[in-house]
């Protein structure tokens, strides 16, 4: 008799249409075969493709279709790391840092002469969370039996490694992912049309498209040319922080950002386009390296504002942390709102459980210097961004309202498509 043990955690914060088999995965681990690898990979990508195309069942109707849903590729190093971790057939998480993990343990008095049957049942069981429990209209992860599903479906994930191990009457099956889907109140994917060309795929640069799934280009070696005297940050992470901040500022400047208190936030007349500043980054790194989740003292960052972020995911990918932190801060506008007056008041600031100061600092129109850090601490991943000149002055408008670029400073240029004025 088979007895499954399913492991799942909630944090506060039938194979079909198989893709063409690869000639060989090139992995050195002898614990599983290329046939196993192909089966794991096909199940995931076929399921993700069904979501992307809007044909996957929910508990009522279909799941929302997905834009920017990426195709997974197999990672031999992740597979080997996982294989090493499950040698004793554990039923608990392996504690591998920087990844999400699904795991299931089976037991049978007759052993497991053909593990493939249970592997398929395991994958189907993980994936069934959405059909059993449903997913909200915004595709957000809110626990409710979606832990394993969230890791399988998270749209930004691009790499997968799976393994299994038979220990007499026990079988452990597990997969790890280079993206984390179980972030509470964050969408597992963005509703939209499945890609038709690479131009439809924007999460990663130089992406392609294959039958509704985006494909990530080859990894590019990390560089530290922008701020070579600062350690712990890379140019790609800097670019992620800066581009996301400017995308959000552009969107609010053009009147496209929903406000929880009604309508959209007003347009901005002289919203500055941010530039990345190495001295500001150095200050953010100094605070981040303390690994204490609290704001730095004002005297330690004179003239600078600050936003902070943390996740319990250890050694969380720094580019993903940069994007997630920026998104969480900015979400305060659509979750809690500011109102049409666009003024930062003590009443807004002091609403219980309704923080707004991260958003207001990001949107403060006279702020234009940005410097950030992502630090791997012992118990969490810590994100810090500092802003110059700082904002968040009580009783002041967050930004001057009006048509985009209608009040840029003399000598400044306007990026018409972005609605942003050039920085001094």
UniProtKB/Swiss-Prot annotation:
The residues the entry assigns to the signal sequence are: 1-18
Q: Which Pfam families match?
A: CAP
Annotated localization: Secreted
Ranges where the SCP domain occurs: 41-177, 242-387
Establish whether keyword Lipoprotein is in the entry.
no
Q: Which UniProt keywords apply?
A: Secreted, Signal
Q: Name one GO cellular component term.
A: extracellular region
Source domain of life is Eukaryota
Give the chief site where it resides: secreted
Instruction: Tell me the Gene3D superfamilies matching this sequence.
Output: CAP (3.40.33.10)
The UniProt function text for this chain reads:
Associated with the transition to parasitism by infective hookworm larvae.
Q: What protein family does this chain belong to?
A: Belongs to the CRISP family.
Q: What is this protein called?
A: Ancylostoma secreted protein
The taxonomy runs: Eukaryota, Metazoa, Ecdysozoa, Nematoda, Chromadorea
Its gene name is: ASP
């Amino acid at each position: 008799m088979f007895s499954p043990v399913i492991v799942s955690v909630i944090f506060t914060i039938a194979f079909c249409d198989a893709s063409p088999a690869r000639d060989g995965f090139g992995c050195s681990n002898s614990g599983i075969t290329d046939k196993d690898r192909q089966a794991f990979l096909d199940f995931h990508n076929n399921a993700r493709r069904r979501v992307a195309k809007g044909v996957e069942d929910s508990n009522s109707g279909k799941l929302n279709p997905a834009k920017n849903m990426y195709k997974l590729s197999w990672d031999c190093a992740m597979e080997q790391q996982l294989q090493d971790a499950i040698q004793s057939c554990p039923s608990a998480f392996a504690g591998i840092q920087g990844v999400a993990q699904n795991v299931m343990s089976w037991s049978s008095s007759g052993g497991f002469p053909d593990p493939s049957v249970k592997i398929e049942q395991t994958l189907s069981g993980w994936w069934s969370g959405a059909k059993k429990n449903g997913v909200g209209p915004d595709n957000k992860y809110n626990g409710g039996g979606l832990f394993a599903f969230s890791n399988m479906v998270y749209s930004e994930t691009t790499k997968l490694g799976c393994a299994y191990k038979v220990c007499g009457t026990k079988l452990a099956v597990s997969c790890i992912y280079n993206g984390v889907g179980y972030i509470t109140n964050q969408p597992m994917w963005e509703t939209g049309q499945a890609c038709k060309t690479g131009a439809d795929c924007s999460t990663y640069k130089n992406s392609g498209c294959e039958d509704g799934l985006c494909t990530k280009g080859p990894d590019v070696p990390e560089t530290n040319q922008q701020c070579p005297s600062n350690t712990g940050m890379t140019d790609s992470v800097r670019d992620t922080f800066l581009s996301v901040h400017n995308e959000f500022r552009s969107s609010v400047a053009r009147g496209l950002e929903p406000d929880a208190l009604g309508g959209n936030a007003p347009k901005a007349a002289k919203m500055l386009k941010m530039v990345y500043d190495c001295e500001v980054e150095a200050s953010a790194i100094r605070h981040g390296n303390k690994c204490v989740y609290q704001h730095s003292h004002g005297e330690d960052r004179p003239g600078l504002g600050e936003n902070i972020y943390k996740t319990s995911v250890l050694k969380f990918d720094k580019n993903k942390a940069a994007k997630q932190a920026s998104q969480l801060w900015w979400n305060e506008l659509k979750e809690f709102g500011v109102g049409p007056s666009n003024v930062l008041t003590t009443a807004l600031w002091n609403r219980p459980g309704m923080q707004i100061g991260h958003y207001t600092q990001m949107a403060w129109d006279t702020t234009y210097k940005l410097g950030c850090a992502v630090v791997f601490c012992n118990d969490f991943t810590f994100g810090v961004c500092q802003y110059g000149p700082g904002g968040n002055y009580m009783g002041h408008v967050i930004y001057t309202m009006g048509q985009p670029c209608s009040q840029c400073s003399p000598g400044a240029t306007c990026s018409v498509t972005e609605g942003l004025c050039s920085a001094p």
